[in-house]
Structures are given as C-alpha cells and as structure tokens.
C-alpha cells in the first residue's frame, strides 16, 4: 500500500509498504528517505503516536493514509536515553520492591510491571525538576520541623 509521511517542517515522502509492516521498519524507511535518525522520529496517525513493536494494521492504517512525523530534538533524545539507562543501571530502591510485591498480588507480572512504570517515571521527573531552593526548603523542614510547625500555626490564625 502507498503511504505518505509528512514532517512538520513541510518535507514529505511517499512509501510503498505492506499493510502488516512493523512501525519500526517504517521508521527505518523514513530515515532513508528523509534523512531523519530513527531514534529522533515519532510517527503519528490521526494524532496517536505509533509504537515501534506494533504493525500498521494494528492502527487500521490503510492505503493512501497520511502519517505525521515529529522530529524530536537530539538533546531530548539523549536525555531520555540517559535517564532510561540510569534507571536500568541502578538497583531498585526498597520502596519500589515493596510496591512491586503489592502489585504482584493483584496483577499479572507483565501488568504489575507496566503499572509500576508510571509512578517511577513521575518520581524521576519530580526529582529532576527540583531546584536548589526546593532542596534547601526540604532540608530545613527535616532539620528544623518545629520551625515549620510554628510557621504553619501562624498562618492558620
């Protein structure tokens, strides 16, 4: 089937692919045609991001469909890859192990793992956004909890 892939900058290409082609293979073809590295590509169909491991047919993409290509900045890709590598390299903290045990009682191993990923990403994102001022405030609250309590009582009057 014939597909059109259009980048936001206006470049586009037409590709001939089977309906059951993997998204990852399509990205490779787009890389060759538009000279955009695979790891910087994000393909969208009707506003939905396409996952590398899925097939075009999984998204009901048919002949003459138009896909949008978002090119991620290289810096963002490197940061994402670095964060993923850091998470993979570090042993899970005890809290994640405990949460994992609780989830394992209620979900299959695969589902429990997927459920756990989101809070871990949120936690990592929150930590990476802490400023020095935020850290100083937290440290002050831990080291001098009585001052924080006094201030809170003063505000509640």
From Swiss-Prot:
User: What name does the UniProt record give this protein?
Assistant: Ubiquitin-like protein 4A
Q: Which InterPro entries match?
A: Ubiquitin-like_dom, Ubiquitin-like_domsf, Ubiquitin_CS, Ubiquitin_dom, Ubl4_C_TUGS, UBL4A-like, Ubl_UBL4A-like
Major site of localization recorded for this protein: cytoplasm
Please provide one cellular component term from the Gene Ontology annotations of this protein. Answer: BAT3 complex
**Gene3D superfamilies membership:** Phosphatidylinositol 3-kinase Catalytic Subunit, Chain A, domain 1
Q: What does this protein do?
A: As part of a cytosolic protein quality control complex, the BAG6/BAT3 complex, maintains misfolded and hydrophobic patches-containing proteins in a soluble state and participates in their proper delivery to the endoplasmic reticulum or alternatively can promote their sorting to the proteasome where they undergo degradation. The BAG6/BAT3 complex is involved in the post-translational delivery of tail-anchored/type II transmembrane proteins to the endoplasmic reticulum membrane.
Residue stretches making up the Ubiquitin-like domain: 1-76
Subunit structure and binding partners:
Component of the BAG6/BAT3 complex, at least composed of BAG6, UBL4A and GET4/TRC35. Interacts with BAG6; the interaction is direct and required for UBL4A protein stability. Interacts with USP13; may be indirect via BAG6.
GO terms (BP aspect): post-translational protein targeting to endoplasmic reticulum membrane; tail-anchored membrane protein insertion into ER membrane
Could you tell me which residues belong to the region Required and sufficient for interaction with BAG6? 96-138
Superkingdom is: Eukaryota
Q: How is it modified after translation?
A: Polyubiquitinated. Ubiquitination by AMFR and deubiquitination by USP13 may regulate the interaction between the BAG6/BAT complex and SGTA and therefore may regulate client proteins fate.
PTM annotation (Phosphoserine): residues = 90
- Please name the source species: Pongo abelii (Sumatran orangutan)
What would be an example GO MF term here? Answer: protein-folding chaperone binding
Which CDD domains does its entry note?
Ubl_UBL4A_like
Q: Which UniProt keywords apply?
A: Cytoplasm, Isopeptide bond, Nucleus, Phosphoprotein, Transport, Ubl conjugation
State one Pfam family annotation.
Answer: ubiquitin
Instruction: Tell me where it resides.
Output: Cytoplasm, Cytosol; Nucleus
Q: Give the position of the cross-link Glycyl lysine isopeptide (Lys-Gly) (interchain with G-Cter in ubiquitin).
A: 48
């Amino acid at each position: 089937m014939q597909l059109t892939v259009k980048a936001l900058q206006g470049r586009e290409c037409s590709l001939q692919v089977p309906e059951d082609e993997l998204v990852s293979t399509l990205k490779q073809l787009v890389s060759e045609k538009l000279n955009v590295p695979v790891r910087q590509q994000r393909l969208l169909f009707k506003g939905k991001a396409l996952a590398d491991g899925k097939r075009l047919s999984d998204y009901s993409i048919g002949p003459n469909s138009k896909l949008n290509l978002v090119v991620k900045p290289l810096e963002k890709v490197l940061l994402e890859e670095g964060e993923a590598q850091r998470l993979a390299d570090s042993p899970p903290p005890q809290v994640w192990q405990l949460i994992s045990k609780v989830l394992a009682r209620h979900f299959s191993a695969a589902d429990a793992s997927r459920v756990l990923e989101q809070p871990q990403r949120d936690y990592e994102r929150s930590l990476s956004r802490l400023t020095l001022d935020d850290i100083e405030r937290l440290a002050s609250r831990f080291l001098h909890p009585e001052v924080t309590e006094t201030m809170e009582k003063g505000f509640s009057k």
